[in-house]
Each structure stands twice: as C-alpha cells, then as structure tokens.
Amino acid sequence: MIQQFTLLFLYLSFATAKAITGIFNSIDSLTWSNAGNYAFKGPGYPTWNAVLGWSLDGTSANPGDTFILNMPCVFKFTASQKSVDLTADGVKYATCQFYSGEEFTTFSSLKCTVNNNLRSSIKALGTVTLPIAFNVGGTGSSVDLEDSKCFTAGTNTVTFNDGSKKLSIAVNFEKSTVDQSGYLTTSRFMPSLNKIATLYVAPQCENGYTSGTMGFSTSYGDVAIDCSNVHIGISKGVNDWNHPVTSESFSYTKSCSSFGISITYQNVPAGYRPFIDAYISPSDNNQYQLSYKNDYTCVDDYWQHAPFTLKWTGYKNSDAGSNGIVIVATTRTVTDSTTAVTTLPFNPSVDKTKTIEILQPIPTTTITTSYVGVTTSYSTKTAPIGETATVIVDVPYHTTTTVTSEWTGTITTTTTRTNPTDSIDTVVVQVPSPNPTTTTTQFWSESFTSTTTITNSLKGTDSVIVREPHNPTVTTTEFWSESFATTETITSKPEGTDSVIVREPHNPTVTTTEFWSESYATTETITNGPEGTDSVIVREPHNPTVTTTKFWSESYATTETITNKPEGTDSVIVKEPYNPTVTTTEFWSESYATTETITNGPEGTDSVIVREPHNPTVTTTEFWSESYATTETITTGPLGTDSIVIHDPLEESSSTTAIESSDSNISSSAQESSSSVEQSSSIVGLSSSSDIPLSSDMPSSSSTGLTSSESSTVSSYDSDSSSSIESSTLSSSDRCSSSISDTTSFWDSSSSDLESTSITWSSSIDAQSSHLVQSVSNSISTSQELSSSSSEESSTFATDALVSSDASSILSSDTSSYYPSSTISSSDDFPHTIAGESDSLSISFITSTVEISSDSVSLTSDPASSFDSSSSLNSDSSSSPSSDQSDILTSSSFSTLVVPSFSLSSSSSLSLTYPHYVNSTTYHASESESSSVASPSMASESANDDTYTLSESTDTTSSIGTDSSTVTFCRRDNGDGCIVTGMPSSSIDSEQTSDVTTTSSFVASSTPTSAEQSITDNPNIDSSQTSASSSTKSSVSVSDTVVNSILLSETSTLSSDDSTSSDTSISSTTNSDTGNINAGSSHTSTASIKESSIQKTGVTLSSSYLSTKLSSTSDITIELITTELITTELTTIEDNEPNTFTSTPSSHSEIFSSDNSVLSKQVDRESTIKTSPTTDVTTVSSLSVHSTEASTATLGENSFSNVASTPSNIATSLRSTSSSSNHATESSGTVKSEASAEAIPSPPTSTDNRLSYSTEEAKGITYANSGSTNNLITESQVAAPTDSTSVLIENPVVTSTFDDNSSAAVDQPSKTKSIEESIMNPDSTNETNNGFIATLSQAQVPSSSIHSELISTTTAKTTDASMNGDSAASNSQPTTLIQQVATSSYNQPLITTYAGSSSATKHPSWLLKFISVALFFFL
C-alpha cells in the first residue's frame, strides 16, 4: 500500500507540474572580464558576465514547475559548474541547468525547475550572474554561419527570451585588431565535446586566386585531427572578428589524416577567400602547436610561399573528469514542441561513449473543425520521423433559446447563460421596469466613495445610499490688519472642497539701504510667508561730492573723504600747507598801526602789509663843551623812536620814574542741552613794586620813563559732553587758582653811578575738575582727543587716560599724550608784540551696543572708571639787549567716575548707539615776555603694567593778557546746532617755580570665573501589566451527508487592564563666583490599555462521498502574562571650570518577567561632551525607546469518527487576529504609547499575538552664561520621533509522540505548524481505534537577539551677554555636545505546548469494502 501511495503521489506531482514564463524580468548588467589575455574586448572572448533579475511568486508558481531562458547568439557557458541556484536570503527556490549551444544550436539555454522551498505565501526575487561567451562565427557550420551575423563592432543590443518576454541591454563590442588582409586563424573550445574547433582563412587576393595550397598539421604529434568534422568552402568576405559569413563550394582536392589536413584549390573568383576548419583534440587543451601551409598565387601576381607556426594557449573550460573520453553528438527527432540538447546517462567506469542528443520536434499541421456539442476534442494522426503529423481540433458550438422578463433596472440587458452540460444556451433579455429611488448622501470614515443600492421587489421603492469620504481641505493663508492669528473653516457638501482660511498679522519689515551704480533710487520689497520677516531693500545712487580746500600746519598736502549715508552729500577735504608770507612795512598818515594780509590760493605767496604811523620823536638835550647849541635828528625804522639830540652848553637837571600795574580776573561758562559745563578761573595775589635808585658823580638831572604794553596769544581747549538714552547725567566742575610771581630789574651804566630798577609780582593757580556720569546703557566707551595749533610758534597739548575696572576684567582703555615746546623770538627792540591765532578741532565719539537674544534676560553690572587729564602750555622767548628770562607753566587735572547700574529685560535683539561730537575752540591773546622752560624728563617704570612717569622742573616769570576768546560747542546727533560763547578779556601776571611729576598707570586685571555645575537626571519608570482571556466553545455534528467544507467561526473577548507609570526627576545645580543656581523638574506619566478583541475563524475541510460524523471542540487559552518594566538612568555633568565639561558613564537596565523565563537587557553608555571655550549655553537631550513582545499558547481538543474507510484529511486553521486599544495618558511632558497585533494568515495552526509599545521623550536643558551676575536656567521638553527596529530569530523544535511508541523530530523554520491526520484500513471490519493521541510541544531555544542602535546628536547655540566694564561682548557658535551609541541584547526563552487527542471508529460495510478493493487495484 505504501508503494501504491508513493506512485500516486509522484503521478499527481508530475501531473500538476507546468511550464511557466516571465520569471526573468531584466538584464541588469553585461560586463567583460579578460579570461585569457586577449588583445581586445570581442564578443567571442570569455568572459561576459550577464546579471539577470528574476522573481518567483508562490501564488502562480509551484514546486516542480519549469521555465526556460533562451539566449540567442550565446556560444557557451564558461562556468565550471553545470547548474546555478536562484537564491534569495540564503534559501534556494529554483535550480537552473546550463545547456550550451556550441556547434549544435544558434542559442544557449537555461532550464530551471522550482523546488519545494517556494510556498504560496512567498514571493522571492533576486539576481543571478551567468558567465557566457557569444557566438560570432568561427567555422563553416550552418550554426556558426548564422551567428556570424549576430553583431557588428560598436554598440549592439543583446536580447534574451523568457517565453514571450524579451530582455534587452546595450553593449559595446570591440573590433578585431588583426589585419583582415593577411591569413586569419581562430580556435574555440567546446566543453561538451571536449574538442577545439580551429579555423584557417587564406590571405586576401583582391582579384581572386589562380591556385593555392593551405592546411595545418600537428608539430609534435600531440594533436589529433577529426577528419569527420571538417568544413571547407569559400566565403564572400569576413565579419568584424575575421570569421566567414558565407560558405560556397569551389574546386579543391583534400588530404586528411589524424596528423594533418590540407587542400589544393584553383580559380577562386574575386571577393572570395578559401577557408578550412576542423575539430582537433590536443593532449593538453591549454597549450599546443600547429604548423600551417600557406602557398598561393593571386591573379596577375607572383606565387607566394609563406608557411608559419602558431602556439596556442587558449581558454579552457574547467570540466573535471571529462578529458580523454570519446563524445558522440547525435540528432534525434522527437514529439516535443521545442528543440533541446540533452546528455544521455553515462557511467565513466562502465561506458566508454558519452552521447549528446540534439532533440528536434516532428513538424505538425493543425486542422480545426466544429460541431454542436459541449467538449473540445483533440486527435492526432501520427507520422514517422521525416514526415508531418496532423492534429485535428474539434471545437463545439451551442444553439440558443431566448427568455424575456421585466426587472427594476433602467436599461435592457441581454445575458447568455452557457450550459456546461448541454448544447443549448439560454439568452435572458431583461426589459426595464424600474422602481422609483430615494438617494441619501452621507459622510463616512473611509477614503473612497461607496454606493449601496437597496432594491425592493418590483413596483416598490429602491433606496440608494451614497457614502462619501470627508471633503479634502484647502488651506489658504492671508494677512489681515489684526495683531493676532485666527483660523476659519468653511465646510462644503460631499464631493466639494472644505476651506480653511488662516489669517495672520502682517510680518515685521527690515529696511536695508545700499548704494548702486544707477542714477536713480529704487525700492525692492521681499515678502515672506506668515510669521516671517519682510525685507525692503532701498538702492540709492552715490551721493554728490563737495570739495573744500583749507590750510593746515603740516608741510605737505593731503585729501580726506567723508562718506555720508544715502541722500546725503560726501565731503572731500583737501588740506594744503600755508603759503609763504612776504611782509612789507610802510608809514602812513594815521596815528595808529594796521596790518593788511592778502591771502592767495594754495601754492601761492601771501602778502602782509604793515602800515605804521610816523615814529614818535624823543628830544634829548645834553650838554656839550661847546658854547653854542645845536640840534641832531636820528631817524629809525617803523615802530622805532626818532631822536632829536640838542646839544646845549652845560646845565643842571633832574629825573622822574613812573610805574603802573593792574589786576584783573577772568571767568567764562558755556551751557548746552543735556549737559552742563562749568569753568571758573581766579587769579589772586597780584602785586608789583619798583625801586630805582639813581646816582651820579657829577651834578646832573635825568628823566627815565618806562611804558610797557603786553599782549599774547593763548590757545586752550576745554569741553564737556553728555549723552542720554532713557536716563543719563553728566556733570563737570572745574576750579582754578593761580599764583604768579615775577621780578624785573633795569639798570643803566651810562654814568659812573649804578642805576637800577626792580619790579616783582606773584600769583598762584590751583585747578581742580570733577565729573560724574550715570547711564542705563550696559556699555560706555569714551574717547576724547584734544588738539590745538598755532600758525606761529605756540601750541597746546593734553594727556588723557581712561581706566575702567570690573569685578572680572578690564574691558577697554585709551591713552593719548602730546607735549610740544614753543619758542617765540622777538625783534631786537624791547618791548615787542607778537600776535598769533589758533583754531583747534576736537571730536568725541561714544558708542554703546547691547545685543540680547533670549526670552528673559536680567543683567546687572557695577563697573567703575576714572579719567585723569593733564595739560601744559610752555612758551619761550628772548629779547636783546635785555637778558631777562620768563617761563610760563599752566597745568590742570580732573577725574571722572562712572558708576552705571542697570536692569534690562528684552524679548528681541536690542542695539543702542550714542554718537556725540564736540569741536572748535578759539582764543585770541597777546604776549610780551621772555621765558624759559626746563626740559621735561619721561621714564617708563614698568612695561608690564603700563605705568609712565613724567617729571619736569620749571621756573616761570611771565605776564599774560587776553583780550577776547570764544568757545564753540557743536552736536551732530540732531541737536540744536552749535553754541558759541564769548569770554571776557583777562590778564595774568605771574611768577612761579614748580616741580611737576605726572604718573599714568594702566593695570589690566582679570578675576577668573569659577563655575561648578551639577546636573542629575534620575528617570524611574515602573510598568505593570496583567491580562486575562475567555473563549467560547463550538461544536458541529454532521451525519449521513456529503460534506465538502464546514465553516467554523468563533469570537473571543480578551479583557486587559494595563497600566504604566513613569516618574522622572531632574535637578541642576550651578555654582559660580556670582552665586548658586538650583533648578529641578519632575515628570510623571501614566498609560492604561482598557480592552481589546480577537476574531478567530477556522475552516474544516472534509472530502468524502460517504457518510461522515464530525464533532470538534476547541478551547483557546491565553496565558496570563505579567510584565514589569523598570528603567533607571543616571546622567551627571560636572562643570568645575569655565567651558569645560566632564561626564561619567551611565548604565541602563531592563528586566522583563514572563512566566518562569527571564529577559534581561544591559546597556553601557559613555557620553562625550566637547565644547569650545566660548560656549556658555549647553543643551542636553536624552531619548529612550522601550518595546516588549508577548506570545500566547493555544490548547485544543478534536474528536471525530468516520463511517468510511476512505481517507479523510482534516485541517483546522485559526488565522486572523485583530487588536484595538484605548489609551489614557497623563503627563507633564510628551509620552506616546502604541499597541499593535499582527495577523498571521492561513494555514499556520498556532496563534502569535504580539503586543508592543514605545515611549518617546526628549528633554532639553539650557544653561545661561556664567559670567553674568544672575544666571538663568530654562528647561523644555519636546517630542522626538524615533524609529527602532528589532529582529527576532527563533529556532523551534517540534516533537510528535504516538501510542505505538514511535517518535519523529521535525525542524521547522518558523512557528507555523500543521497536522494532517489520515486513518485508513479497508481490510479490517468493525475495527475501533480510540488510542490515537498526539502531543506537540514547542521549545524556543534562547538564541534570540535584538540589536538596536540609538545615536543622539545635540547642537547648542551659545550667547555671551555678560557686562564687563564699559562694553558688551557677544559670541555665538554651534557646538556638537553629545553623541551616544547604545547596543542592546535580549535572551528570551519561551515555551509553547500543544496537546490534542482524537478517536476513530470504523464500521465498513460490504459496499465500502468493494469500493476500497476497486480503488486499490485502480491505483
């Protein structure tokens, strides 16, 4: 019986196997690799590697099915193996045999057979690589001559066929590099025959051949020539690879043996070339040598004798065990429909001949006839080999009868009902008699439109329910005048479009002005989407230029360009040196002196015309020895005194002396908007005395008078400025006192007695200045530069020093100094007057900028700055004949203290700029003295702390008088213009001796900031899950009927109550020199899954023609699963120094509990944090994903009884699973939970329920700059999607145990199980078998692994907005902080048990016995 069943199975398998097509779907690539050191890439040279794509679908292909790939113009496969497997993911789904065409067919083929690994639920696809060599000719056989025309040199299209499907690819073939006019040779190895086909073509004669001899022979006797496989002919040309393309007969004589072959020919026409080819068998296919005869005479040419020898080292196919065997190729005609090549069975140890058969089909002709009937019949009239067979196809056709009826439709329909068992078909014509309809349209949740028609009986009312998906939505965003955003939804009817109108406020606008090359102005507006910023670009033409030329004190010319903003005017200032001056003095009739200056343009000469009144006349009367009187007039130049000397006879005389002095005080003040300038000067202690004794040896009288007029020019500068934004105060006060002392002596030595006069006066000067500045700006930068110059020989200079200090750093400093000397040379006569004028320009520019980019910023700064200034004026003059010496020294100093304190809160960038300008002071003065100043000395005490000391010692005796002065203040920040203040005339008479020492020090000190930060993250997640299930039992009882299929349905309800809670606490501590910051946060989330349902359907098949009684009960039990998830994570970041982070590794563990199995997960993580030195804001993110799977077990019981002795196959499937869940989440952050169950299709008999969940959480913490007074910490939590992939690999083992103590072990690659039970014993009567018990156990080997990787990259943008001293610094730099890689491993042993029992009772009758015996003999 077993043999009979085996034969039946084989018969059914062969009967169901079929030929399929379309498996190969593409040629992905076709590349060449040089397998034999060939000179060019020819199509016939191995190896061409063809990569083909294939696809096998288990729904259309079955094990045993065959498919064939035909490869035209392919000579052979160059692989060493005989077949190739179509493999996907390591599984073989088909095996393909190689059939090389060689010299037998013009194509090669690949015949494939599907194996048992392909099931209906599998679709496999992949690629296969085939090493091949193409056939482009090489012999005179019909196969080679046909294939010699397949390709040409260059680009070709290679096409393969899989049934009706054509696969093509373009490829480039290179032409032969051998000269076609010479002799041509080639050899090809044929693996199936283990022989080489060698070709020899005679050299070319363009006008034809008169005669010739050609052939080849073995050189050493190691090559055997097969004289039975020889082709001789003449070819009309050769192809691109030097192979014959035609073969025609001609006159020749052949001589052939196993050692050589040759022919002698005559009279070959022009355009043709003789050739000869034969099969040879070298003893070594890889190396052999042939000698060639080459004698020929071309028409109208001389006889040529050029024999040659070639050594062949060609390509050999590695066909093991095939050398030295006689191989015979035969052709046989068969009844198949296609041509094939096959190898007959061959045993090397017994058989000596290996036969290759070329199977060619018998040609057939088909005749089609018809008749009235049901079935199509085929009959074949066979024919012997060599004739044509006839196939007669008798096709049936049916007659029809027509039936007409009414129906509720709107059109007339005609339906033909074909009768499968009779030759008369029925044509049903339905005439419309429609019912009225009521149509209802409604929305539903699906994405497509559904129409349901409820048709009532004839003459009733039909209902049409149209279900439409929700309308698509078109969202339009537009601007409006309000300051807030709003959304309006307009809902249309079904099949319409809903509109969502989003109204956004207008974007803010940023305007940028720039120059361009055009002569006109233009404005371009760039509008962005809502919540963006619009840009307005104003392009202005370049400003016009105004050129001003002025004189300056340098000896060279210079040009300065001042560029203003658009729509302004640019200024070009050309500074030229002063012109030389020519002075001319002349008398005039007026009583006063005047000076006229004629100024010319630059590079000219100025003229000064001095007009003086006539000199006064001094009359002197003196005695002389004469007795008469006489008068003498002495005339001097301008500004002199003419003398009239009267000589009288000797008489007595007397003289008088007059001295006069005066005191005066000067003061001046100037007032400007938003600033105050106070300056006062007082001069005290002015006195003079005169003591002039006169004596003479002889009586005499004399008169002496002294008149002194002093005038001087003094240039000085003083300015105070203030700026105010929000609140600003600048105050300044100066106090000056002066003490001057001077002594003047006169003497006369014209007589024997000494006459002298002494005048002494003194005064003191004390100057003091103080300033106070208060401002809310976070940075103040002050720079003052004072300068004045005189066109004569006087100058004024000052030294300013600004020192600013903060608790952490010195931010800025500016020091400038200048100390000139001035010498005034007077005329020879005394007294003298020198006039000069000075115009000085001073500009002070103050700029403060604050940039804040944060939601909330609080800054406090308390810097202090001091300002010291000293100025000196020195003048030196001398006169002759007097040797008097006068020195002048003036000095003043003041200090400024700046203590700003502010608090700033901003939500956007803030920029504050303070421009301030002060310029122009003019003084007019005159001086008449002789003075000297000691040379000052300056030394640098230390270069490291920038300390300088200036020492000088002066002795001053001076007299200064000023007639008028003006001071001018100008503002350029939209102020009130310029203010000119006049000062009254004043005079200073002083005598002073002083030692002055000035020390300027600048010390830059920085207090390092030490910050200590500690971040602790302790998330704790506890999860618990419990579930229980209940199911219903169903049974079906069928008796005494024919059953084809029974459908069982069962519905179970799975109630589940899962809860998950998560607690996360975060604490942060920052310690810095400005204070401590503690911040903390907590996170709690709870998720619960309330209920889900499972729908199960089962199909029981029974195929029997006899009575069957079947009862089935099933009990589905879902294991009680408790899952506990504990997650602990600790992350610590310590910051002990600025901008330096260190981290400690953290550990991550998870423990799952499922029955008695343990699932563990251990993660070791090491975090690396790198920051740049300027990073003060750190963002740390962490992300965790958790998942778990749970499996269920199925317990069932089946019992059945058959009242038949025929086989009955019963298979029960439980296949479909669906799950739905409700979630309730409470969280301060964002927690996502998901639950899903995967349905397993039929026919597996086990149920696999998977429950997975994932949580996603991202935390971001921002730390503010540690350099500011008040640090700020911000924490944010956002949701970050993460994809996590887990792969579970299982190796279950299934064991079945029977009551006869037999056992079987089956390895199954998956958890799919099927059991087929067959009971049949027709020879026993009234046999009862209740002992069949099957136990199925499944053990999952703990070799499962899950690998997951998580890479987290965080980028932080830092902003430093600390306030140090008088300025603000900002820095922004992206920095990659953290990169984490985590690897997890799971080990999860699970146990699933299946138990079943069955019992059967057989009571066969005589009829059943008879049927069984008949079936037995039939099989």
From Swiss-Prot:
Start-end of Polar residues biased regions: 1012-1022, 1079-1093, 1138-1160
Keywords in alphabetical order: Cell adhesion, Cell membrane, Cell wall, Disulfide bond, Glycoprotein, GPI-anchor, Lipoprotein, Membrane, Repeat, Secreted, Signal, Virulence
Chain segments annotated as transmembrane: none
Annotated region (Disordered), positions in chain: 652-752, 864-885, 926-966, 981-1035, 1051-1093, 1134-1177, 1211-1252
Post-translational modification: N-glycosylated and O-glycosylated.
Membrane topology: Lipid-anchor; GPI-anchor
BP terms from Gene Ontology: cell adhesion involved in multi-species biofilm formation; cell adhesion involved in single-species biofilm formation; cell-cell adhesion; hyphal growth; single-species biofilm formation on inanimate substrate
Disulfide bridge positions per record: 73-150, 96-112, 205-298, 227-256
Range of residues in the leader sequence: 1-17
Record carries keyword Disulfide bond: yes
Biased composition (Low complexity): 928-942, 951-966, 993-1011, 1023-1035, 1051-1078, 1212-1230
One of the Pfam families matching this protein, by short name: Candida_ALS
ALS repeat feature ranges: 365-396, 401-432, 438-469, 474-505, 510-541, 546-577, 582-613, 618-649
Localisation per UniProt entry: Cell membrane; Secreted, Cell wall
Glycosylation sites noted in the Swiss-Prot or TrEMBL record: 665, 919, 1301, 1326
Superkingdom of origin organism: Eukaryota
Prodomain positions: 1399-1419
Record-level GO cellular component terms: cell surface; extracellular vesicle; hyphal cell wall; plasma membrane; side of membrane; yeast-form cell wall
Lipidation (GPI-anchor amidated serine): 1398
InterPro entries: Adhesion_dom_sf, Agglutinin-like_ALS_rpt, Agglutinin-like_N, Agglutinin-like_N_N2, ALS, Fibrogen-bd_dom1
Function: Cell surface adhesion protein which mediates both yeast-to-host tissue adherence and yeast aggregation. Plays an important role in the pathogenesis of C.albicans infections. Forms amyloid structures, essential for cell-cell association and cell-substrate adhesion to polystyrene.
Subunit and interaction comment: Forms homodimers through the tandem repeats. Aggregates in amyloid-like structures, with self-propagating secondary-structure changes, amyloid-characteristic dye binding, and induced birefringence.
Record remark: domains: Each ALS protein has a similar three-domain structure, including a N-ter domain of 433-436 amino acids that is 55-90 percent identical across the family and which mediates adherence to various materials; a central domain of variable numbers of tandemly repeated copies of a 36 amino acid motif; and a C-ter domain that is relatively variable in length and sequence across the family.
Similarity section: Belongs to the ALS family.
Protein name stated in the entry: Agglutinin-like protein 5
Organism, as annotated: Candida albicans
Species lineage: Eukaryota, Fungi, Dikarya, Ascomycota, Saccharomycotina
Gene: ALS5
